[in-house]
């Protein structure tokens, strides 16, 4: 894993051997790597530079990399990221903090946005609330799991999926890699206005997609902090996911991994 403190404390590379998962800046010089946004998207576009693109301060403490942004004048908050690896299961734990730097009560939710080259298969358990909006993506729902198989022929515009999840994980399979995010599951009622726990975005030029998860939308008193932990797993896995048996096999593998089973 590589982190660029000079560009919003982004995670800019995640590899297994020579296989890169994340979208690189050579493909899109603005939207690449993985970052944290503040939800809901009241800030419009682009994201506040001081949180998304400006330099973060850095320190190392107890084998963890700790990154801190400045305070954004619009959102009245700052972001801190603490990242460390776990030797036992070769995962990475990312602890995000959003700190209210105003003198009034504000409401936020954390929003992790991870950009990868367009392609592959993305899947996650469907929550009780299901889709919050009509999805523009061609998805398959089978035995409680939402499956998205990328097909460039079906992409003719920006496309997005909004869904309430379950079990607290999202997985993405490429030709050679299986990537899994584990995070605290939230209910429909805990989602930020106009947002959902799981969101997928496909760029209209078919070059990249975003794997997005969000945490609970909460009120913060002045100087209070949201703390949100996400765990990443990356495994080399080339199995196809086309038949029911193949889907069952990969689901069993993912669930064992996120539950800490051998």
Q: Predicted regions span which residues?
A:
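Well-ordered beta-strand positions in beta-sheet-rich domains
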Residues: 80-82, 225-229
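Tryptophan-centric aromatic hotspots in well-structured domains and transmembrane helices
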Residues: 36-38, 111, 232
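Extended, loop-rich substrate-binding clefts of extracytoplasmic carbohydrate-active enzymes
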Residues: 41-90, 105-108, 119-121, 204-207
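Hydrophobic beta-strand positions in extracellular immunoglobulin-like domains
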Residues: 97-98, 232
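Acidic-aromatic substrate-binding/catalytic surfaces of carbohydrate-active enzymes
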Residues: 1-53, 251
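Short hydrophobic/aromatic-rich beta-strand segments that constitute the beta-sheet cores
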Residues: 13-14, 66-69, 94
